[in-house]
Amino acid sequence: MTKIGVFIPIGSRGWLISTTSPATMPSFELNKAVVQQAEHYGLDFALSMIKLRGYNGPSEYWVHNLESFTLMAGLAAVTKKIQLFASVAMLTMPPAVVARMAATIDSIAPGRFGINMVTGWQPKEYQQMGLELTPEHFARRYDYASEYVQVMRDLWTKGVSNFKGEFFQMDDCKLSPRPSAHIPVVGAGQSERGMRFVAEYGDYNFIGAGGDMNQTDGARTMVAKVEAAAKQSGRDTGAFLLLMVIADRTDELAFAKWELYKQGTDIEALEWQASQAGQDTVAKEGSTAAALVRQIKNPQPTGMLKLIGSYEKVAAMLDEIALSTPGLKGIMLTFDDFVIGMEQFGQYIQPLMRSRNPNLKRNLDAA
């Protein structure tokens, strides 16, 4: 069965850079409602990003943000089954501290916690705190991340680290209590080097498939690259596709919402995004930074794959992606309106999905 998760709304406006999209204001209560809905409907995981500064522009996109680890610790205490991933901006916290934070959340939710590794791409986000995303950082960020994960894994598995690397030197560094189970590490490596990092040190790689609408075959190339990198590293790293669902009772109602959001596209925010991402002078064509710069050339509220339509149509498109993309292990959903969208998915979309209902698939195959 294809795994399904949700990328929760930890930042204002969710994932729509628009003044006419739902004015999502992040709070614990909102995210608790979304994650408890997700758990109720049998979703497999919830992931929260880390963003320390938003964009310029009237939409106030990501201007208001919660902190990822503390949010997920709270959510760990009010859920029972769903897997939870927090994100760490690696330049802001030492790996030994993050390893202890993860072990603490594991004691709240044994076996249900993981970490998303973030190297950073928006220079001003770090400059405001006296940190720099220099060209040297951009060139060596995944070397830094590799050492970071090695330190954490030392502490989680052995309770002590004497790791000696270029970026980190541990001196009888201790951690106790250790986690009750393996803590998965995930990333969103889109470049060749990023994919290699996740293949060598991660459990899953979250990928995009561009900003197209209702395209069900766009992830195949990226999934194949993730699989190739994993094979080269001798590991099985799963690819998870990020996409947005905008659904309603009919195609017409769903597309009307998208047209409304497009009317409010925040050009100033997109220009800010491009100017910040463009400072990564070592970024290559397949990288996240390159994709963010490219978005200003075709301005729209989101640069991710969008599935727009009736409940039946969205269910069919999700099945097409899940069942006809070789190597794809799962899908991570965002919604235009998270509370309504999660309810729509659980009540009307997921029950129609063969990829989520093995009995339904068997019955249809036998018909």
Curated annotation (Swiss-Prot):
It catalyses: uracil + FMNH2 + NADH + O2 = (Z)-3-ureidoacrylate + FMN + NAD(+) + H2O + H(+); thymine + FMNH2 + NADH + O2 = (Z)-2-methylureidoacrylate + FMN + NAD(+) + H2O + H(+). FMN binds at I50, K51, N116, E125, R141, Y142, S191. Keywords: Flavoprotein, FMN, Monooxygenase, NADP, Oxidoreductase, Plasmid. One of its GO terms (molecular function) is uracil oxygenase activity. Coiled coil: none annotated. Its EC number is 1.14.99.46. One of its GO terms (biological process) is alkanesulfonate catabolic process. It comes from the Bacteria. It comes from Allorhizobium ampelinum (strain ATCC BAA-846 / DSM 112012 / S4) (Agrobacterium vitis (strain S4)). InterPro entries: Luciferase-like_dom, Luciferase-like_sf, Pyrimidine_monooxygenase_RutA, SsuD_RutA_monooxygenase. Gene3D superfamilies: Luciferase-like domain. Belongs to the NtaA/SnaA/DszA monooxygenase family. RutA subfamily. NCBIfam families: RutA (TIGR03612). The FMN-N(5)-oxide reacts spontaneously with NADH to produce FMN. Requires the flavin reductase RutF to regenerate FMN in vivo. This is Pyrimidine monooxygenase RutA. CDD domains: Alkanesulfonate_monoxygenase.
